[in-house]
């Protein structure tokens, strides 16, 4: 909850508390805030343990599914589209169409002949009418 508060922010909060509450009421306010946070943390840990007891072994499955949703939540729409629909090939978005795609073996287990094997080791064919 307060993970993003640094030392400078904490110092500013204490100074504002000194101005607003005064030096005689500030220690009591700090004690009250600390006890309220401690009670809230204890309540939330109790709810988690109660839920774990009520649901049983399915609780771990539920946490796994929630973890997967959390991973998807952090993705941008472009990353989700690239990962799930395009199998990680983002050349559609980057315009890098000349990049070789990784070859997947076919059902027989061989990747098939390369384009260099089909052309041969001779000179590169040139068509003067094509240019």
Swiss-Prot record:
GO BP annotations, alphabetical order: protein transport by the Tat complex
Major localization listed first in the record, in broad terms: membrane
Bias kind Basic and acidic residues: ranges: 96-106
Null mutant phenotype: Essential for growth.
UniProt-annotated stretches for the region Disordered: 90-131
Keyword Membrane appears in the UniProt entry: yes
Membrane topology of this protein: Single-pass membrane protein
MF terms (GO), sorted A to Z: protein transmembrane transporter activity
Entry's localization field: Cell membrane
Spans traversing the lipid bilayer: 2-22
Key words of the record: Cell membrane, Membrane, Protein transport, Translocation, Transmembrane, Transmembrane helix, Transport
CC per GO annotation: TAT protein transport complex
Pfam families cross-referenced by the UniProt entry: TatA_B_E
Function: Part of the twin-arginine translocation (Tat) system that transports large folded proteins containing a characteristic twin-arginine motif in their signal peptide across membranes. Together with TatC, TatB is part of a receptor directly interacting with Tat signal peptides. TatB may form an oligomeric binding site that transiently accommodates folded Tat precursor proteins before their translocation.
Subunit structure: The Tat system comprises two distinct complexes: a TatABC complex, containing multiple copies of TatA, TatB and TatC subunits, and a separate TatA complex, containing only TatA subunits. Substrates initially bind to the TatABC complex, which probably triggers association of the separate TatA complex to form the active translocon.
Family: Belongs to the TatB family.
Protein known as: Sec-independent protein translocase protein TatB
Record organism: Mycobacterium tuberculosis (strain ATCC 25618 / H37Rv)
């Amino acid at each position: 909850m307060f993970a993003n508060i640094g030392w400078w922010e904490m110092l500013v909060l204490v100074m504002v508390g000194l101005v607003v509450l005064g030096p005689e009421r500030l220690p009591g306010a700090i004690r009250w805030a600390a006890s309220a946070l401690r009670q809230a943390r204890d309540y939330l840990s109790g709810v988690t343990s109660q839920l774990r007891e009520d649901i049983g072994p399915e609780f771990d499955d539920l946490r796994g599914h929630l973890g997967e949703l959390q991973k998807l939540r952090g993705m941008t729409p472009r990353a989700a589209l690239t990962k799930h629909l395009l199998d990680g090939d983002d050349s559609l978005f980057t315009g890098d169409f000349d990049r070789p795609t990784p070859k997947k073996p076919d059902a027989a287990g061989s990747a098939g002949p390369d384009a260099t094997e089909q052309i041969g080791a001779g000179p590169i064919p040139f068509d003067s009418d094509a240019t």
